[in-house]
Structures are given as C-alpha cells and as structure tokens.
C-alpha cells in the first residue's frame, strides 16, 4: 500500500463512497491522502492521525513526513484558466 494517495473528486462522486475509501486507505496503512476538488481548485489533506486541512487555490501542498522536501502549488495541479 502506498504512503500517499491522491483522490480526484468528480461531480458524480458520492460523499459516503469517498469517506468509505478514506477509511479503507487508512486501515491499509496509508499515511496521507490528498482529496482533490477540481471544481473549486482546492485540496483537502487527510492524515492517518485524524488531522486534516483545506488548502485553497493559492496554497501549497507539502509531502510532510511522507515525502520530505516535496512541495507543489495547488494551482499547478490544474490547467491554466
């Protein structure tokens, strides 16, 4: 199982299914999940310890202790508008 998972939310995704996936990921040993919301150009970070945070379009994502030294601007995850 990977340490980091990226989940991209589409307009048809159901919240309950996403929550179920998150539980499955963390049960399997995933440490960090980035749930990417293309419509709002934002990301929600979920951590295995239960912590989490919204990162908006002007924010930065880091690999934290999962990918030390890695960072990316949220805006770079999406095509230019």
Model-inferred region functions:
Residues 1-28, 32-81:
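C-terminal interaction segment
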């Amino acid at each position: 199982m990977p340490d980091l998972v990226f989940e991209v939310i589409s307009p048809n995704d159901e919240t309950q299914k996403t929550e179920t996936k998150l539980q499955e990921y963390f049960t399997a040993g995933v440490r960090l999940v980035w749930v990417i919301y293309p419509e709002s150009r934002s990301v929600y970070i979920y951590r295995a310890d239960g912590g989490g945070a919204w990162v908006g379009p002007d924010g930065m994502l880091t690999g934290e202790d999962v990918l030390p030294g890695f960072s990316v601007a949220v805006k770079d995850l999406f095509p230019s508008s």
